[in-house]
């Protein structure tokens, strides 16, 4: 049995419950969300000036 410590990813969620799916598009379904395997890349999207007014948060997702 192999233990994989990287069995999670990060998704970007706004204050209204929508997930970032790429190219400035948002959707309610987590399965469509763009997933990031590094918190560094997720933070880059979160801090993007285009999305300041959306009140973004980073969500840790089990995969």
Indicate residue ranges for each PLM-predicted region.
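Short, Lys/Arg-enriched, disordered terminal segments
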Residues: 1-6, 62-63
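Cysteine-patterned extracellular/luminal domains and small secreted cysteine-rich peptides
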Residues: 3-4, 21, 49-52
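Short, mixed-charge low-complexity intrinsically disordered segments
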Residues: 39-63
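Short aromatic-glycine-(Arg/Gly/Cys) micro-motifs in beta-strand/loop hairpins
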Residues: 5-32
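C-terminal catalytic core of Y-nucleophile DNA break-rejoin enzymes
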Residues: 36
């Amino acid at each position: 049995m192999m233990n994989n410590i990287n069995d999670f990813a990060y998704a970007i969620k706004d204050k209204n419950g929508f997930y970032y799916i790429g190219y400035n598009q948002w959707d309610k379904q987590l399965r469509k969300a763009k997933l990031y395997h590094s918190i560094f890349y997720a933070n880059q999207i979160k801090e993007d000036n285009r999305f300041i007014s959306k009140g973004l948060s980073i969500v840790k997702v089990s995969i």
